[in-house]
Curated annotation (Swiss-Prot):
Similarity-based family: Belongs to the methyltransferase superfamily. RsmH family.
GO biological process, alphabetically ordered: rRNA base methylation
Highest classification ranks of the organism: Bacteria, Bacillati, Bacillota, Bacilli, Lactobacillales
GO cellular component: cytoplasm
Organism of this sequence: Lacticaseibacillus casei (strain BL23)
Alphabetized UniProt keyword annotations: Cytoplasm, Methyltransferase, rRNA processing, S-adenosyl-L-methionine, Transferase
EC number from the UniProt entry: 2.1.1.199
Secretion signal, residue range per the UniProt entry: none
Binding positions (S-adenosyl-L-methionine): 34-36, 53, 80, 101, 108
A Pfam family hit: Methyltransf_5
Gene from which the chain derives: rsmH
Molecular function terms from GO: rRNA (cytosine-N4-)-methyltransferase activity
Name of the protein: Ribosomal RNA small subunit methyltransferase H
Length: 313
């Protein structure tokens, strides 16, 4: 098995924000290579940790690394949008904290066979869950022009969505687009030369957009956070690390909605209890990686940590 290096981002900050209780029940919604999982486990005595990942490779790698799983740890090979169902199956209806480390892990990016990266020539795949049928090849070759424009614009915030989608539409009538490098060349051809020279790799935004569409990432995140807000006990916290603006905007909006005072008539001397929010923002502004972390882990640059706490039912 190929070894892939993975540095867990905001390791101490994200777990410290959970304020772990030794006897509590916690969820790591994104197991990855187990960095946050181990950090939480180290603080548990009689408590319990359930770690989710839809990527079979992540489950297998962490299982092998542990050898024998600690009795406090349960691994669940499911998407975190199945949070409530999976926990109910385990007899759990309330938890003390939930952690999310969103996006693609370094091993997924660095495994050329997975097709997540524009740096390697590989089959167009991008599935986090290898059990699903929809992959990047299907989207690129079969989705209508209008749908390609929509996802490139909405999920990639790509200014040249129409031009790139048109190049793809024309090319696939000649032969199927099956590899990442084929797609990269079409993306480059759809972006004016001057624009290609700025803003990083020209394929970055479109690859992000296709990956989000393949894995239905934003819908899964919204659904999972809605469940998480209901699952946590009073005093429990949700800790979320995001790596791009779409995720961060969604988390920020959802957290703001549930932590804000409901509409009440002006001039009331006291806000009634019924209008008080059930949650509070632990950090008004996102927590960012330290200079020390940025110096050793370049993939931490875009990371933001947001934390919310349930203060009453």
């Amino acid at each position: 098995m190929t070894e892939f290096k993975h540095e867990t981002v905001l390791l101490k900050e994200a777990t410290a924000a959970l304020a772990v209780k030794p006897a509590g029940i916690y969820v790591d919604a994104t197991l990855g290579r187990g960095g946050h999982t181990r950090q939480i486990l180290n603080q548990l005595t009689t408590g319990r940790l359930i770690a989710f990942d839809q990527d079979e490779a992540a489950i297998a790698t962490v299982t092998a690394d542990f050898g024998t799983l600690p009795k406090q740890l349960t691994l669940v090979h499911r998407n975190f949008r199945d949070l409530t169902d999976a926990l109910t199956t385990l007899g759990i209806t309330e938890v003390d904290g939930i952690l999310y480390d969103l996006g693609v892990s370094s091993p997924q990016f660095d495994d050329s066979k997975r097709g997540f990266s524009y740096r390697f020539d590989a089959p167009l795949d991008m599935r986090m869950d290898q059990r699903q049928t929809l992959d990047a090849k299907t989207i690129v070759n079969e989705w209508p022009y209008a749908d390609l424009v929509r996802i490139f614009s909405r999920y990639g915030e790509e200014h040249f969505s129409k031009q790139i989608a048109r190049r793809i539409e024309q090319a696939r009538t000649v032969q199927p687009i099956t590899t990442t490098f084929q797609l990269v060349e079409l993306i480059k051809a759809g972006i004016p030369a001057k624009a290609r020279r700025t803003g990083g790799h020209p394929a970055k935004k479109v690859f992000q957009a296709i990956r989000i569409a393949v894995n239905d990432e934003l819908s899964a995140l919204e659904s999972s956070l809605e469940q998480a807000l209901k699952l946590i006990n009073v005093g429990g916290r949700i800790s979320v690390i995001t790596f791009q603006s779409l995720e961060d905007r969604l988390v920020k909006t959802m957290f703001k909605e549930v932590s804000s005072v409901q509409d009440v008539p002006r001039g009331l001397p006291v806000i009634p209890a019924s209008a008080q929010p059930n949650y509070r923002l632990v950090n008004r502004k996102p927590i960012l990686p330290s200079e020390e972390e940025l110096a050793v882990n370049h993939r931490a640059h875009s990371a933001k940590l947001r934390v919310i706490e349930k203060i009453h039912d």
